[in-house]
A protein has these predicted regions:
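N-terminal helix-turn-helix DNA-binding module of bacterial transcription factors
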Residues: 1-58, 72
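Short, well-structured alpha-helical segments in soluble
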Residues: 101-114, 218-232
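Flexible loop/hinge segments that line or gate small-molecule binding clefts
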Residues: 121-166, 183, 242, 267-279
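Flexible loop/turn connectors
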Residues: 230-237, 242-319
Length: 319
């Protein structure tokens, strides 16, 4: 395969002349014709990444994702990709495994890689996150969390929780168990939980609250430990669909998958509708969140005004 030096030698010009031609710079008509012919004859493909680094925009977008094999992440990324294709961006993914240090390093790595913008799907925002973001020379969009003065796309977590709490209370369920996550995640650990509590409180219902993990396997262990001696429960709530599925798994292993109780989750994961009985879930439009994030990031890249915070409504499934 020919490189830029080979093309320069064949044309009898310098490498800088070839580079100038490839980047749309000024060269003589004769040289332009000669280079066009040689490049076509030898099917020369310039290094697009190297070219992009010399240009004002690289057409590279960095997305920092917290989990793999996640319905929420998968759908959000699909939304991002759909808009990237419209604007000829290339998407780079950095998986952090819910590790805060890895998220910080990913922000710095993408900045050094000269991406045009960054989409951060964070579960927690620390002071260090904010310090790094403030120093970056590229726009950043948050998805799933919000913070003053940062552009963000969020789901209406409080309303989602309130809907579930109100639904359970209206059915006269009194013995309610909720498996939540750490309050370090403000959206799920604080807002969603508070919505549930407030919705139940309307009916004078106060749930038993346990702390667990976003990770399905860890949630299964926590659920098993807390429910092994429990009885008479009317409703069980998982802060996410994977946690709700962990609850369902526990009862199915107890040969009580169709007992006199109802399980609720959040996210709209298709798996919740494949189990028996189906789990009642609040559906979040993750794909739309991805498209909104990328469209707003594109506006910021070109110094246009973008909405500071977008709240996406939730939908109810199997109520």
């Amino acid at each position: 395969m020919k490189n830029i030096s080979d093309i320069a030698n064949l044309a009898g010009v310098s490498k800088s002349t070839v580079s100038r031609f490839l980047n749309g710079g000024s060269v003589s008509p004769q040289t332009k014709e000669k280079l066009s012919r040689i490049i076509e004859e030898h099917d020369y493909q310039p290094n697009q990444f190297a070219q992009s680094l010399r240009a004002k925009h690289t057409n590279l977008i960095g997305a920092i994702i917290p989990r793999m094999n996640s319905h929420a992440v998968d759908e959000t990324v699909k939304g991002i990709v759909s808009v990237c294709h419209q604007h000829q961006y290339q998407l780079l993914l950095n998986y952090t495994g819910l590790d805060i240090r890895a998220e910080i390093e990913a922000l710095e790595t993408f900045s050094r890689s000269k991406v045009d913008g960054i989409i951060l799907m964070a579960t927690t925002l620390t002071d260090e996150h904010l310090e790094v973001i403030e120093k970056l020379n590229v726009p950043v969009i948050l998805v799933g969390q919000s913070y003053p003065n940062l552009h963000s796309i969020i789901h209406d977590d409080y309303q989602a929780g309130f809907i579930v709490g109100e639904q359970i209370g209206s059915k006269k369920h009194k013995n309610v168990v909720f498996f939540g996550v750490s309050e370090e995640d403000v959206a799920v650990g604080v807002k969603r939980k508070q919505g549930i509590i407030d919705g139940l409180k309307k009916y004078d219902v106060y749930p038993e609250i346990y702390l667990t993990s976003f990770k399905y396997e860890e949630a299964k262990n926590d659920v098993s430990e807390k429910l092994k001696n429990a009885s008479g429960i009317h409703a069980l709530i998982g802060a996410t669909d994977p946690i709700a599925l962990a609850i369902h798994k526990f009862y199915s292993q107890q040969n009580n998958a169709t007992g006199n109780y109802q399980i609720f989750g959040f996210g709209g994961n298709p798996m919740t509708q494949l189990v028996t009985p189906a789990i009642t879930t609040v559906k979040f439009n993750y794909f739309k969140a991805g498209t909104y994030a990328m469209n707003q990031l594109n506006e910021l890249i070109f110094s246009k005004n973008a909405v500071s915070k977008t709240v996406i409504p939730v939908e109810i499934e199997n109520f």
